[in-house]
Swiss-Prot record:
GO terms for molecular function: DNA binding; RNA polymerase binding. This is Transcription elongation factor GreA. Residues 4-75 form a coiled coil. Pfam families: GreA_GreB, GreA_GreB_N. Belongs to the GreA/GreB family. The keyword Iron-sulfur does not apply. One of its GO terms (biological process) is regulation of DNA-templated transcription elongation. Necessary for efficient RNA polymerase transcription elongation past template-encoded arresting sites. The arresting sites in DNA have the property of trapping a certain fraction of elongating RNA polymerases that pass through, resulting in locked ternary complexes. Cleavage of the nascent transcript by cleavage factors such as GreA or GreB allows the resumption of elongation from the new 3'terminus. GreA releases sequences of 2 to 3 nucleotides. It comes from the Bacteria. Keywords: Coiled coil, DNA-binding, Transcription, Transcription regulation. HAMAP family: GreA_GreB.
Length: 158
C-alpha cells in the first residue's frame, strides 16, 4: 500500500486552499453547470463549441476540486512561533547575501502547495530552499541555479 503524499503548509496557506475549494464548490461549479445547460439549448451537441468549452471547464473545475481536497486532507501544518532562529527550517524567512557583491535576498520557505516566488515564498523542493534548509546564520552556501552556481552567506532566519 502506497502512502499518500503529504503537503507541508502554513495554516494561512491551508486556509487559502480551503477558501478556493469552497468557491469552486459553491460558485464555479454552479456557473459551469449553467453554461452547459445554456449550450445544450443551442441544439446539436456534435458541433457545439460552447458546449465543448463548458464541458472542458467542468472537467478542470472537478479536477481542481479533487486536487484541493487531497492537498487539504494530507496537509501537514508548519508551526512557527515567530521567534528568530539560527537554523533555516520550513516556514522560516531566510535572508542571505550573495557573495562577493553583497546583494541581499529574502525568501520564506514553504511547501509547494503555497509557493509563490513573486511574493517571496519558495517551495521547499526548489534548488534554493534545498541548499538552505538545515543551514545556520553565518554559513556560506553554494546554490545551484539555472544561471550557474552562486555563493551566499545566511544573514538572518526569522
Amino acid at each position: 500500500m502506497a502512502t499518500e503524499k503529504t503537503y507541508p503548509m502554513t495554516q494561512e496557506g491551508k486556509q487559502k486552499l480551503e477558501n478556493e475549494l469552497e468557491d469552486l464548490k459553491t460558485v464555479k461549479r454552479k456557473e459551469v453547470v449553467e453554461r452547459i445547460k445554456i449550450a445544450r439549448s443551442f441544439g446539436d451537441l456534435s458541433e457545439n463549441s460552447e458546449y465543448d468549452a463548458a464541458k472542458d471547464e467542468q472537467a478542470f473545475v472537478e479536477g481542481r476540486i479533487t486536487q484541493l481536497e487531497n492537498m487539504i486532507r494530507n496537509a501537514v501544518i508548519i508551526t512557527d512561533n515567530g521567534e528568530e532562529s539560527t537554523v533555516v527550517t520550513l516556514g522560516k524567512t531566510v535572508t542571505f547575501k550573495e557573495l562577493p557583491d553583497g546583494d541581499e535576498e529574502a525568501y520564506t520557505i514553504v511547501g509547494s502547495a503555497e509557493a509563490d516566488p513573486f511574493e517571496g515564498r519558495i517551495s521547499n523542493d526548489s534548488p534554493i530552499a534545498k541548499s538552505l534548509l538545515g543551514k545556520q546564520i553565518g554559513e556560506k552556501v553554494a546554490i545551484q541555479t539555472p544561471g550557474g552556481e552562486m555563493q551566499v552567506e545566511i544573514i538572518s532566519v526569522k
